[in-house]
Amino acid sequence: MTQTPPQAQAQTEPQPRPQPLSWKLVIDSTDPHAQAGFWAQALGYLIEDNSPLVERLLAAGAVPEAITTHAHGRRAWLDLAAARHPDDPYDEVSGTGQGRRLLFQRVPEPKTVKNRLHIDVHSAPGQRDAEADRLVGLGARVLRTVDEQGGSWIVMADPEDNEFCLN
């Protein structure tokens, strides 16, 4: 009788399923607060409110005022802004979303090439064109309409030219 080497045996035994991981999509931006505002309106999300944490750290002298700003009517981080799903949990101390979340971080350069990753926005049935008009009113642009055998969608760009699709 032959024995299976331990390495081969380990490969054939079912592996335990890993614990699901949380994640956020981080998007480079020249104006993170404007982008968070656009995407919050586009998706029906909330702009994260980090002002209690920012104010507390400023009062304690833990951070310089130069890394903060006023945006959306409150104190915020200068180089970061996020939009989060209104039904998802968030940390009450920092205001940071713990669920579906888009985080915009300031970078010095504008977008120069096609996205390698993009967002698909799903409109209500029969409402795609009306939704495209609404998004254009918020600052998006229509780049093209795609009609293929597998489906139809509108390719759009947000105010900083990040492509996304509207189904």
Regions found by a protein language model. Give the residues of each.
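Aromatic/hydrophobic pocket-lining residues that form the small-molecule binding cavity
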Residues: P32, R128
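Vicinal oxygen chelate
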Residues: T2-A8, P14-P20, K24-I27, G37, ...
